[in-house]
């Protein structure tokens, strides 16, 4: 199992004498340590797969981890006493995101939290609408600020009453009041938001010893990826799951902690040593990704930050190309220059477009690069585009599914009952909402209540009751009938395809219907697959050993629900997009540095390396110095950006940049100086931006004709 590991990686895999922290520098092979350790636990140390959980932050990372573990365990047998020689039941492993694990815990323990197992999971847009309703405003920036404040409170395990008691000013008091009402509204809807998927299990484990003990006994070894990105709530959940046994391995890198703005805290690394005094720390410092020049620049930058743990990356990949820093007159010149040099570099190296990434600090920087790439007919992929599940047509179908599972989900009812149109207008829904509010019931329940006739006519009530009858029939069948049959009947009953062709032009309708069919196909495949065990087996302990070659979950790392539609619906809410379905296109990658974390590219252009952009000012005024904590996080972000590059790294900055209606003078980022690059005169940026004709002439010269 340990073939090909270096000594530090091997120690990380084999150490089982207590809590373990693997400090894994960029490109040092941390995923290999996690996957090899899972295999070591099962094949060599007698652990059953159902007692192991590995958690990470993204569906993509979890999918990669599952795939690697499946390959490692192919053909392997158990070493568990009494089960020696049996094929490893890979499908019983839990390899998932934090939120997927949270959903499984909530499904099992819903009754302890006043929830039904088919609770709804609200997305960001649903939550935005709820906050907007509480604030009674259309001020979107204000709504987002309050929404983010509520999220930070939840992630810090601050209750609404505590937020109210600690409010320092009127704005905080208003936000705390909204928080209190927001939590009550969620409970009335029998719904949770994404933050609740971690917060509620943590609070439950803290309050209920029996539940906590049950989960500690079932998940007997934990592996935590990207530990530096955990927030207070996630750390609390992990600590409660680990319990006194403290059988866990946390893998992370304090130098790559770049999510402070969403509640992640480096304090968790410090706290780990306090809460677990016997913590064993292992450092992975050999980098398998980048050249010596790239690593030297990264080490020089991050050395300016105070250190929790001393470590320094090294590589045996050779010195590599010099790192270049190119000034540009303005944004347009910068984009022209980068795209031209990328094209020339690709030709010289006989590379592919997919070998190149253009990284930037903020999404606002992407537009000009998109324009130039399109003009030059260079294919590109923009990271962070519209999620498959954010498309309106997918949200429409999801609204029906949510309502089938949970009749108390008012936002789902409003969307489903009005799409397609059924002659139920806003006036009718407002009257229904007022009636339901006074009766303190859901909209769905209010449709059937006596007294509604005093508010609405039979002509208004009958379409709503017909719709709710339809949903109830589907819900009754969803518990027992195959998911495929229920989905087909639902789609036939709502006439969604006809609605699309009525509401949109033919091309749009075709695209939207194609997306719906793809989504339904995905659901049906999950609904008809053999049941995988995952966490459900870990909790119940009643599943057989299964077959390592089949049933391995490739979506969320947890239990599928076989042919039952209801269990699939919560899985849908967790998926940010259909991962791994599209082949990696031969295209330049445009991405923020945050979105590039965990990825690598042979050749990287890091653009906009200017004061105010990298490092970003945040909320600071231009005249005020950026505070030390922000600079340290921005420096870690620069470190992440540099270490995405495998073979070459080119930096650019603008001398001037447009801001609103004025042109501002820019200074090169302090991080360029901190890289301590070889002294060399930078390329001149005094010439006018190249015309397309000049570029064509240069390319012809480069091509020898």
Predicted regions located by residue number:
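Acidic, low-complexity intrinsically disordered tails
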Residues: 1, 535-556, 679-705
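Conserved helicase C-terminal RecA-like lobe
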Residues: 168, 366-378, 391, 398-678
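Pre-Walker A adenine-sensing motif
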Residues: 6-14
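Motif I (Walker A/P-loop) of helicase-class P-loop NTPases
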Residues: 31-39, 65-66, 235
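Conserved RecA-like helicase ATPase core segment
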Residues: 2, 7, 40-43, 71-72, ...
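A basic/glycine-biased coupling hinge at the interface between accessory DNA-binding modules
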Residues: 17-20, 39-221, 245-246, 266, ...
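Helicase P-loop NTPase motor core
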Residues: 22, 26-34, 49, 110, ...
